[in-house]
């Protein structure tokens, strides 16, 4: 059995082995280390204080279960000084004794055991070793205070042999594991002393350099700026290293992102300037985060990234047909627009604007176009935006400034050629902070948006490849310059048959899925869907229809959840069952009841939520020929009433009106739903008809509605919104519609199935209106005319 330097016997092979992840135990030194690996803990449970074990360094500190090839060849026999339990494992104190050469690992469970032999050192020239040790001792006394180590204490107190003294000095230097292993593996004493002397000289030089750097930094910066000092130290170190390599820090990562962003020349120059500013300020500076956020926005924008665009028009048409019922003219115009984009390869075409009431599919059309063409789709909601900075961004001088919604949309899209939908453009407001609608003029102008400048970025960004789409409910709310930049595609609404088809193919499956109802558990008949459309909704779109179907599904889901046997019952909803699920009928066709007396006529109006019918009521009473007009009417509508009355008075004889009574009676014209503002010229024909009916005691036909502007000479002028108005008449159960002759061309836009159920009567003058709208025989005792109420809460109407 071999003897160790301490006089103890070397352990027999195989002996317990403790691998160290980092660091080296030198002979003659004491090491305290935490122990937590299961096999290392098992070793500590098997030994006691005073036992001798082997300690060896790992080549790879990340290796959890090292094998022979993962361990160095030279280790140290160590005496266990103390073992104590701590919160996260054990703490071991060991003392290095002698080197050993590792031969093999013979056991790995439950702990490591190894075979090895004592590795004796070779003294060589004893006098040379003594002189080298003395020199090393003096040098250690000098270097110790500079390096902040206990080298001076070791030099003063150690009486070890030259080889062990070299080990003690090497252990105190705090060297990397690789350099410590170079010393441990050197079995010749003289070369070991020489190697340690060189390492001590390097440590001294590094200490001098650090002192110089600290001095340079302190001369430039005041006391207490800890973070700035650390940063300046790093810069000074990099300066002394003259180009040394370093890992990628935050600044380097930001520089790399800017390099990869493909910035144009002007943006690149600004980014480089801001990068230099960022380098010159410390993280504690208020400007640091401002500059960094600005550079991150520049790096995140798609300056050159483009989506691969699919230009298959058949695919676009198929997608539109799949997701939208009807709207044939709308789809055709969309395809024409996409064809121009395909042929020119540019998005610098007129901006499409989908105009129509809520729920007709304006927003979803944009999504369908994006899906079919492969472009990312981004929606910007503009409803209620009153600040121009919401679109253009805030200038960086403001605290918390950020880019506007246009730049946000491009960042979200990650490409410079997305489809951007500007939703509810007509809901834009204006305030003392500027007009956001005016800011849209540059965005939507193909000649100007190539150099769009956001206030925050203050850099030109090319928007010419972006396909902008807009949606509005009321075109009249747009300014003339903005309206001029848009190509309007009107979506007037759906017919009852189209609504039923949409409900069957889209709304019902969607609600069944959302309510976790098996399609086989619920069946809604076509008659029930038709009744929902007729009796529970009165809209141009299908949004309310979707809510009613959702309500029905909730009621059915309750029945299924309450099923006693746990099996889902099959529910078939008939039209007669709707009262149980949806409550009382909400809408009735009361046109006949309202027009059953003279003096009441049915008109047609356009509102931002679609077409609607309105009633013009007139009454007369003893008086002095005065006229009262009520119903919250606008100036244009009041003038239409006066013009209609003037025509009646001037043609009283041919209309069968007693002129004497006109001077002795007051007239009252009222449009119900007085809480709703109304305006527009198209109620002129309806007011004339109501007045003529009142004064001639002839009822207006209950199945007839009308629209048109009248002149003092009795001409009927064209008006707008014909398709929406006719669809509203059809929804209300009207069978005959009187329209201006010059609106005959607009009848082509009305769906064929609606035209087949309506009689459209085109007129040029008032005499034709009277012939088409009034009954032949007068009624007895015309009285004071019919006055009935109207449903409140309807949207503002343009008559």
Swiss-Prot record:
Residue ranges constituting the Lon N-terminal domain according to the UniProt record: 15-204
Top-level lineage group: Bacteria
Upregulation: By heat shock.
GO biological processes: cellular response to heat; protein quality control for misfolded or incompletely synthesized proteins
Cited SUPFAM superfamilies: P-loop containing nucleoside triphosphate hydrolases, PUA domain-like, Ribosomal protein S5 domain 2-like
List of catalytic residues: 682, 725
Compartments, as annotated in UniProt: Cytoplasm
One GO CC term on file: cytoplasm
Disulfide bridge positions per record: none
InterPro entries, per database record: AAA+_ATPase, ATPase_AAA_core, Lon_bac, Lon_bac/euk-typ, Lon_lid, Lon_proteolytic, Lon_Prtase, Lon_prtase_N
Protein residues bound to ATP: 356-363
Record text on subunit structure and interactions: Homohexamer. Organized in a ring with a central cavity.
Similarity section: Belongs to the peptidase S16 family.
Name this polypeptide is given: Lon protease 4
The gene coding this protein: lon4
